[in-house]
From Swiss-Prot:
Tissue-specific expression: Expressed in the esophagus, oral cavity, skin, tongue and reproductive organs.
Origin species: Homo sapiens (Human)
PANTHER family for the chain: F-BOX ONLY PROTEIN 50 (PTHR12125:SF1), F-BOX ONLY PROTEIN 6-LIKE PROTEIN (PTHR12125)
Compositional bias (Pro residues): 26-62
Pfam family, one: FBA
PTM annotation (Phosphoserine): residues: 31, 37, 49
Protein's job: Promotes cell proliferation.
Name of the protein: F-box only protein 50
BP terms from Gene Ontology: ERAD pathway; glycoprotein catabolic process; positive regulation of cell population proliferation; SCF-dependent proteasomal ubiquitin-dependent protein catabolic process
Length: 275
């Protein structure tokens, strides 16, 4: 696996992990269009199941008290700033259930079930639509045509931080770190086979508070099919962040047998009070 540590992000109010030799993209328009909601997937028909013997009823586990839930979370998160209180709509028990910090907020982060600890499994050209190759629920997918039989597969989704269990005072006063990570296949289909674009948006989902764009070029060394990691941490981005718009592109090439793809896996967006 090859790790790409990039850091020169576009947009003010951010610090990056460190330097790296990557090709940066020009700034995007200030108001990127949020992805439309994907159509709901139809529910599969229910099949009658054979009668099963009744299992003995087990007692439900005891729910933690509000004080115990607070203690458990603060042990996990670390101390908060003095005076930071929960809004009335949230309780510590609800936060313990949602766990909005230190977890991946993206839906279907590994749609094709690929293991990054092994080389990308060999695959040939295919004529099957991408949506039939895995579970892409939560992603909005489109194709961007290029020249010379090439194209981008563009996948994006928008994370609602308040809906995930975070709250305004935490985001504005603490400004926890927001970490974005992704893995792409070194497919050798072109010099640049992957792009990452992330916007931190205000409540209107149009005002850009901070952004990061990167188009890495791999070294070309080693066997093809290895996984390359891209990551970035947003810090000190300023108050008002309510949404995270995550978008990545993977390059394809049309061949006689169909489309040969660059695969992406283990995409993640997470929020941390400490790293």
């Amino acid at each position: 696996m090859e790790e790409v540590r990039e850091g020169h992000a576009l947009g003010g109010g951010m610090e990056a992990d460190g330097p790296a030799s990557l090709q940066e993209l020009p700034p995007s328009p200030r108001s990127p269009s949020p992805p439309p909601s994907p159509p709901p997937l139809p529910s599969p028909p229910s099949l009658p199941s054979p009668a099963a013997p009744e299992a003995p009823e087990l007692p439900e586990p005891a729910q933690p008290s509000e004080a115990h839930a607070r203690q458990l979370l603060l042990e996990e998160w670390g101390p908060l700033s003095g005076g930071l209180e929960l809004p009335q709509r949230l309780t510590w028990k609800l936060l313990l259930l949602r766990r909005p910090l230190y977890r991946n907020l993206l839906r279907s982060p590994n749609p094709e079930g690929i293991n990054i600890y092994e080389p990308a499994p060999p695959t040939g050209p295919t004529q099957r639509p991408l949506e039939t190759l895995g579970n892409f629920r939560g992603w909005y997918i489109r194709t961007e045509k290029l020249q010379q039989n090439q194209s981008w597969t563009v996948k994006q989704q928008c994370v609602d931080l308040l809906a995930e269990g975070l709250w305004e005072e935490l985001l504005d006063d603490e400004q926890p770190a927001i970490t974005v990570m992704d893995w792409f296949e070194d497919s050798r289909l072109d010099a640049c086979v992957y792009e990452l674009h992330v916007w931190l948006l205000a409540a209107d989902r149009r005002t850009v508070i901070a952004q990061h764009h990167v188009a890495p070029r791999t070294s070309g060394r080693g066997p093809p099919g290895r996984w390359v990691q891209v990551s970035h941490v947003f810090r000190h981005y300023g108050p008002g962040v309510r949404f995270i718009h995550f978008l990545h592109k993977a390059k394809n090439r049309m061949e006689p047998g169909g489309l040969r793809r660059t695969r992406v896996t283990d995409s993640s967006v997470s929020v941390q009070l400490r790293e």
